[in-house]
């Protein structure tokens, strides 16, 4: 698959999802996974997760020539990720980076029937993915560059997002349309405390399509509003149309050409 044939490059976060299967239980969440007990589970389902695989494989299934650019470690989990990609098309793993000094990112998805899902996540090699890992020569000739989940990639949000802005600027200068997908950072972690307003101000001038969810954008730009939300209620149900317009307008003012605010089951708020 040569660079001349590629239409879309999808880069950023990728991980191995390990999903144990559970039998229905009569006990509730309070009795589940009690310390010192053994819980019998069924076979584990393995799949790739993150935007590199989710978006990239969806485009591939639609027949769009796509190159995937993510980073894994030289370990068993990394080989599993590569093999899962190769199962769709042997060429899909060609753009992946294998770093012998890093471990592969993985998530354990604990999802018993009738109990809210719990995720155990190790960022692994995603934390060291940087602008230099994207060879602009391998991007040139494509029409779209899609980057996903900088809040889950340490090099992308440290130093006020200098590496994220550098990456998007280089790709934009190469003549590609750019899109940026976000993820929800834990508010109590380094990612959640990062100066996202500053990061977006530096990055969005090089982004054509910006795709955050409503709760992600509130956390990043209006922390007081975010902290005042009622837990357990859909965020979109607590925010009126005026607030959506205000948030979208602020993002457009930072430089993005199009903003698509994801509203869960309420759909998408799109503004140019």
Residue locations for each model-derived region?
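Conserved phosphate-binding/catalytic loop of the ribokinase/pfkB sugar-kinase fold
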Residues: 97-99, 109-157
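Hydrophobic beta-strand scaffold residues
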Residues: 66, 92, 178-179, 211
């Amino acid at each position: 698959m040569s660079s001349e044939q590629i239409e879309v490059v999808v880069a950023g976060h990728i991980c191995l999802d390990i999903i144990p299967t559970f039998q229905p239980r009569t006990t509730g969440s309070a009795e589940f996974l009690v310390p010192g007990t053994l819980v019998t589970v069924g076979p584990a389902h393995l799949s790739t997760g993150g935007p590199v695989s989710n978006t990239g494989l969806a485009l591939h299934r639609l027949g769009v020539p796509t190159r995937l650019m993510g980073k894994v470690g030289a370990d068993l989990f990394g080989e599993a990720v590569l093999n899962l990609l190769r199962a769709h098309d042997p060429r899909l793993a060609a753009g992946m980076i294998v770093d012998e000094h890093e471990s592969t990112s993985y998530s354990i998805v604990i999802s018993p029937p009738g109990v809210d899902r719990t995720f155990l996540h190790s960022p692994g090699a995603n934390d060291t993915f940087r602008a230099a890992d994207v060879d602009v020569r391998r991007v040139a000739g494509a029409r779209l560059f899609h980057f996903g989940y900088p809040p889950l990639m340490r090099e992308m949000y440290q130093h006020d997002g200098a590496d994220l802005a550098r990456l998007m600027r280089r790709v934009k200068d190469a003549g590609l349309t750019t899109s940026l997908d976000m993820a929800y950072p834990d508010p109590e972690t380094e990612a959640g405390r990062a100066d996202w307003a500053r990061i977006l101000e530096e990055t969005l001038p090089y982004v054509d399509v910006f795709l955050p969810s409503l709760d992600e954008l509130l956390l990043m730009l209006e922390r007081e509003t975010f902290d005042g939300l009622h837990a357990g209620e859909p965020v979109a149900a607590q925010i009126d149309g005026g607030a959506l317009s205000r948030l979208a307008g602020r993002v457009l003012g930072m430089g993005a050409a199009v903003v698509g605010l994801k509203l869960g089951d309420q759909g998408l708020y799109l503004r140019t």
